[in-house]
Amino acid sequence: PGTKGFVSMIAEDGTFVKAEPIFKDIKVVDMIETANRLLAFVEGYEVRHAVIEDVHALYGSSAKGTFTFGYNSCVPEFFCAIAGLPYTKIPPKKWQSDMHKGIKMVTKNDGTKTVKDVKKMSIVAAHRIFPDVSLKRTNRSLKDDDNFADSLLMAEYGRRHFK
């Protein structure tokens, strides 16, 4: 979830089907337009199970930022509930510990200490599992998108655990 979040679909055999950003315009979240886009995304497919990241507000975030984050993070869950799709909410550490297995730890300096760079690790893991999928947000993007990578990895996590 989040304004830059993605929705991804993979087949039962693990092949990539499609993916796209949840919100068309991250500056203006239009719920009707988003719901219609998500309905079009699943139309014609038998969705067996959806996995939604169970996220929480970050300590130190502003009230406005926390409210916006909470509002946007509920969109996938509301969509699944309204569309009648089975879903499970999974904490990031749970799916990451499974999907990052075998990936050498990547670190970054957060200003005070060295911490694990889970965004880069997700990109590496997604490239290993889906080597033919470009993780670029758009055709014009220069860098891989960690939101796209996370979405793919959560779809794969769901495929492995919720058959």
Where are the regions a protein language model picked out?
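Phosphate- and other anionic-substrate recognition elements at nucleic-acid/protein interfaces
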Residues: 1-163
